[in-house]
Each structure stands twice: as structure tokens, then as C-alpha cells.
Amino acid sequence: MRLYSHLPLLALLVVQAVGQSQVTSEDPARDAGSTSNSTAATRPRIPSQEEILGQMPPIPPIRTGSPQMDVFYMMFPALGSLLRWGSLFPAQSILGAMPDNLQPEAAASRVVLVLADDATAKARVVRQNPPLNPLGQLMNWPALPQDFQLPSMDLGPQVGSFLAQLPPMPAIPSILGAAAPVPAPAPAPAATPLAPAPAADPPAAPVPDAAQPAILGQAALQNAFTFLNPSNFDASGLLGQSAPTFAPPNFDFVAQMQRQFFPGMTPAQQPAPAGTDALASDISEVRVRPEAPYSQEAQMKIKSALEMEQERQQQAQVKDQEQVPLLWFHMPTTQAQVKDQEQVPLLWFHMPTTQNQDATAEKTLEDLRVEAKLRAFERQVISELRMLQKEAQRRAGNSGMNSQKANALKRQAKSQEQALSKEDIVQIMAYAYRMANEQMESEKGKQDKVYAAYRTEQSPMTMEQRQWSEDQAKIQQNPQQIQQGPMMMQQRQSAEDQAKMQQSPMMMQQSPMMMQQRQSAEDQAKMQQSPMVMQQSPMMMQQSPMMMQQRQWTEDP
């Protein structure tokens, strides 16, 4: 438990001790004699909240090693103090340890055993234990310290007892001392005269003990190579014999020696009993789960289960609402109860009260100080929680907007990734060229119309003057035609009349009066027009030079 976490509590205790000493420093006799707190000398003054907060010791900066946690504790001191007090609470010793089924580490195991699909169908293969390594057993002695010294002791009895406790070594068939094979009988030599029997030898003297080992060694050497003769090395006999079978070596005496001399040492690897050789296991493979604690499939299952539970609750609520009777009796509630329920804050600190305590009793200075500090702490915690709630809502809104933007960008990128064929490209280019040409033509027509409207609005009189000047130029160029005009018109009219008369003699006979009247009317109209033209011609001739100059001036830019 860290010491700096107790500093705020120690400072609070010091402040309370100082306040108690100030209150108890008054005259005890005066306090005992007075029955009420109405006098100004005995009744202490209730300090304000600012004074109480000013008397609190400064909060030392918390250095947990994590910059994020340090910044959080500095920005939210009330919540930081709650977290520190919660960490100091001995929850495991009072409430007990958390069970394994509730711990996420135990639930998210990384090793998964995959069993075989059909264990009986697979071939049963006997598991072979690896052979023991005697060299490893011999080298498995503990390392001796550098200053290790053996005590001086008499090892005679111990060695004798050890040799007596040793297990018997495996018996190896010895070839030493074997009886020599009987050689083939040699041919009998010639008969010789029998020698007289020798006299009985005197009893041999006892051989001293020192000469017995030499005699035994000589006998062993004499009997060692007696079997090395040609008769024993018969090829046909050796091939017909079976190879000698030796008992397997027993390495257990090494472990026995190790247990005898070093009782506290871990014994070497012991060979498994014959009955423990089991068959092959049904586990086909062992897989390792990835580092992700919860996969997407598990999250989807959890989400679907939660949604189903919510739907079930909603259906139950709707069913309960439908079963509400027509007549519902409400218990009468007072306005005070409703007001108290509405004014309950987010965090409510209930002070321990007793039934016999009088509500009108005067509170001591320490109680008032504690209540004021608790109220200030409550307001601070509520304000910090509201700030955190607003920040969480703002971040949730920003994340939603960012996800919408990301989805929009993804949709745009997906539409742009579609490949276009050559025909699509040609159609798009043709459409672009056609639209460009139509746009140019429409703009050109608009410009012409605008220019024509501008010209007509700007100079309507100049257009009339231009038309009149053109007419005057034509009249000036052909004055003789104007003079000869009436005669030529009469001749032309007479020629046309004659042609018509020739084409329609019947019409001439039927309506001679109509033809004469028509001819007389036309002649009179022509005679009336000709004097007016002749009178206007001199005036036109005089005005023509002025009109030509005006036309030239208007046409020049």
C-alpha cells in the first residue's frame, strides 16, 4: 500500500484535531453551567464553504507513471480521490476472491484441444517410451560448491554396508575355469617294461598363506587358454550353436546409489512400468487461439442474444400494459413526497440517523464541517460527472459523423473503381464532342441575336436612312428609265391586253364594256401617278449627293 495515498486522510485528521482543540479550549465550567447555546461566547461561528475549502491541504500531484491517468487525476480531483479510496478498500479480504468463471482471463483460454473425428477408426499405435540415457543419469549429479570439503571420517564400515546393500550384478557366463575338451586318443606307443612302483611320498608341508594367491593365479593362467585348440574351433560346430543370451543390464543401481548418498536430491528419471504404456491418444492436434480476446463471431452472438432479450422484455411490457384493468386505484401521494423525489441528486450521501435523535438538536462544529465538506465534494463530483457525460456525447456524435463520412467516401471510391470498356469510352467521347458543338452553336446564335438587338436598339434611324439612301441611288442611276417608265408601262400593258384578247375572244365578245371600263381605270391611275413622279425626281436628284455622304459616314467604323 502506497504511502502518498494516505496524505489527504492524514491532513484531514490534523485539521479535525485542531478544530477540536479550539472548541475544547473554552472554559468547561461556563459550558457546564449554561443550559442553552444562546450566548455568543459559547456558540461557535459556522464557517463558510470558502473558508472550509481554504483550510483543506493542497492536493499533491499524483504520479502513477501513466501520463493519461495523471492528467485525469489533475482534471478531475474528486473522481480521482474516489478511485484512490476504492483501490484502498480491501475488497478481496472482505468479499472473497473473484471466482474463475467471472474472470475474463480464465474464460478466454488460448489453448484449444481438437479431438479426433473417429477415434475407433484410426489405427491403434502403441506409444513407445524413449529409452533411458544412462549417461544423463550419471551426469545428473548436483554441482558442488567451491568451498566444499569432505569431513574426515572412517569409511570402512559404511563401504562394507554399501557393498552389502548393492544389488547383485547380472551374471555373465564365464569361460574361465571351464573343463578342457578331451582330445582324440593318440596311438598307443610300444610296450615298455614296467618300472617299479615308487615309494610313498611323505606328506607335503603346509604352504604358507602368502604363496596361495600366486598358486591360484598360476592355475587361472594355466586354465585360461586350455580351450584354445583346433578341436574347439570347428566351423561346422560353431555355426550350429545358438548365440549366447545375456541378461539386460540393470541400470537401477545408479538411482539407488544416488538416493542413498543424496537423499534430498530429485531422483533421476525412472523407467515407466510395463502396465503404463497406453495406446495413442485421441487428441489429433492442439491449436492456439489468436491474441484477440473476443472474435467477431462471438461478438455477433452476444449482440444477437442481447437483442433477443430486449425484444422479449419489450413484449412483456406491452403485454403488461394490455392487461391493465379499466379501474385503477392510485394511492394518494402528497406534494412533499413528489418534491423530494424530484430533488434527489445523482450522488446522495445519507448520514446515519437514529429514531431517538431530535431533529432540532444543535450540531457540533465538527459535524457541520464534515457536512459542508461532503456537500462541496458532492457538488464537485456531480459537476465532473456532467462534464464527462457531455464529452462522451460529443465524442459519440463525432464518431457517428466520421462513420457517415467514411461510408460516403467508400461508396464514391467504389463507384469510381468500376472499369469502363472501349465502347463506353467511345460513347462518352462522342457525347462530349456533340455537347461541345451544340453549346458553341447555341452561344454563337445567342451572340448574333444580342448583337442584332443591340444594333436595332442603338440606331433605328440609321437603318431607315440607309434604306432611303439606297433607293435614292437607284433612282439616280436610272433617270432615263424613270422618264421612259410610263410609256413602257403602257406598251407592256397593251401587249398583255392584246394577248389576252387573242386567247379569249369569247370573253371579249361577252364583256366589251367591262374591258373598256377596266382599261380606262388603269389609264387614269397611271396618268395620275406619272405627274407626281416627275415632280419628285428633281428633288431626289438634289438630295442624292447628301445621302451618299451620310451613308459613307455611317458605314465607316
Curated annotation (Swiss-Prot):
Per-repeat ranges for Sequence: 458-483, 484-509, 510-535
Main location as per UniProt: secreted
Keywords: Repeat, Secreted, Signal
Start and end residues of each stretch annotated as 3 X 26 AA tandem repeats of Q-[SG]-P-M-[MT]-M-[EQ]-Q-R-Q-[WS]-[SA]-E-D-Q-A-K-[IM]-Q-Q-[NS]-P-[QM]-[QMV]-[IM]-Q: 458-535
Biased composition (Pro residues): 186-206
Annotated localization: Secreted
Signal peptide: 1-21
GO CC annotation terms, alphabetical: egg chorion; extracellular region
Pfam family for this entry, one: Dec-1
Keyword Heme attached: no
Feature: compositional bias, Low complexity: 501-519
One Gene Ontology MF term: structural constituent of egg chorion
Origin: domain of life: Eukaryota
Cited InterPro entries: DEC-1_N (IPR006719), DEC-1_REPEAT (IPR006718)
One of the GO BP terms on file: chorion-containing eggshell formation
Chain intervals for the UniProt region annotation (Disordered): 23-60, 186-210, 485-534
Record function comment: Required for proper assembly of the eggshell.
Protein name: Defective chorion protein
